[in-house]
Amino acid sequence: MSFLRPTLALLAVTALVTTSAQMNGYTKKEVTPEDMELLQKAQSNVSAYNRDVTSRICYLKVDSLETQVVSGESYKFHVSGCGVNSDKELGGCANQNCESSKYDIVIYSQSWTNTLEVTSITPAN
């Protein structure tokens, strides 16, 4: 029976790590071309912005991505970007030499209802 102890300990640790990731919400994810397409589609379309989102930026690059499964999927893009003065400048930055800062862009997607919404754009901590 002592041979079961290491196996049971491994299972317990795996369960604990899995539970911890679920309880903490967001999970790190490798950025795919589909993720970049979703970011561009939502972030460049001002009508997809929640009315509480007042920041307007363009993004230079995605530094990392975290996702959270809710009643759809929430994407938290950690980006380098620049403030813009016009909705026409949203999306990828046309001016690659702008003065950049770090931002978090949260996008909510629910494919079965065709929902795509920018829920927040905040300076990164």
From Swiss-Prot:
Cell compartments where the protein resides: Secreted
Inducing factors: Expression is up-regulated during infection of host tomato.
GO molecular function: cysteine-type endopeptidase inhibitor activity; peptidase inhibitor activity
Stored InterPro entries: Cystatin_sf
Keywords from the UniProt entry: Glycoprotein, Protease inhibitor, Secreted, Signal, Thiol protease inhibitor, Virulence
Residue span of motif Secondary area of contact: 68-72
Protein purpose: Secreted effector that interacts with and inhibits host apoplastic pathogenesis-related papain-like cysteine proteases. Inhibition of host proteases by a pathogen extracellular protease inhibitor forms a specific type of defense-counterdefense mechanism between plants and microbial pathogens.
Designated name of the protein: Cystatin-like cysteine protease inhibitor EPIC2A
Underlying gene: EPIC2A
